[in-house]
Curated annotation (Swiss-Prot):
S-adenosyl-L-methionine binds at L76, G108. It is found in: Cytoplasm. One of its GO terms (cellular component) is cytoplasm. It comes from Rhodopseudomonas palustris (strain BisB5). This is Ribosomal RNA large subunit methyltransferase H. Its EC number is 2.1.1.177. Belongs to the RNA methyltransferase RlmH family. The lineage of its organism: Bacteria, Pseudomonadati, Pseudomonadota, Alphaproteobacteria, Hyphomicrobiales. The gene is rlmH.
């Protein structure tokens, strides 16, 4: 199963990008041993539409173009479900074991995600009630993906 992160906005050079790349690399190394076929990141430019509805619609169209048929869609949204790391790992493991071709994680723009896109998701995740900068959400997601791989591998990184 291939994992993909689709994010509205680009990470500029700096500590957030370095940390994101570190977790991505760690996952790639361990994930291949667990039957995952890598982790892709697609950055989509923020819409320049005048209103929030227009921006969300343009961004949703760009996101939809990257969603492969048969993939499990996971959206990140403040209204989503908060799951612990073990449950997150178990879900990724189930999708892998069910031969789902891919799991696609979507991080929306400043206005959030179009409700229709959120409804299509098999899972809508939240990293709590706080509002997080998009750069941090990407780093936190990549860390959780890496942590999930360590849990599935029985690696001591996760000590819960």
């Amino acid at each position: 199963m291939r994992l993909t992160v689709i994010a509205i906005g680009k990470l500029k050079q700096g500590p957030e990008r370095e940390l994101a790349e570190r977790y991505r690399g760690r996952f790639d190394d361990l994930g291949r041993k667990l039957g995952f076929r890598g982790l892709d990141i697609h950055e989509i430019a923020e819409s320049r539409a005048r209103d929030a509805a227009g921006r969300m619609a343009e961004e949703a169209a760009a996101i939809a173009a990257l969603i492969a048929e048969g993939s499990s869609l996971v959206t990140l949204d403040e209204r989503g479900k908060s799951v612990d790391s073990a449950a997150f790992a178990a879900q990724l493991g189930r999708w892998r074991d069910e031969s789902v071709p891919g799991t696609i994680f979507v991080i929306g723009g400043a206005d959030g995600l179009l409700p229709e896109l959120r409804r299509k998701a098999k899972l809508c995740l939240s990293f709590g009630a706080a509002t997080w900068p998009h750069q941090m959400v990407r780093v936190m997601l990549l860390e959780q993906i890496y942590r999930a791989a360590t849990i599935l591998a029985g690696h001591p990184y996760h000590r819960a």
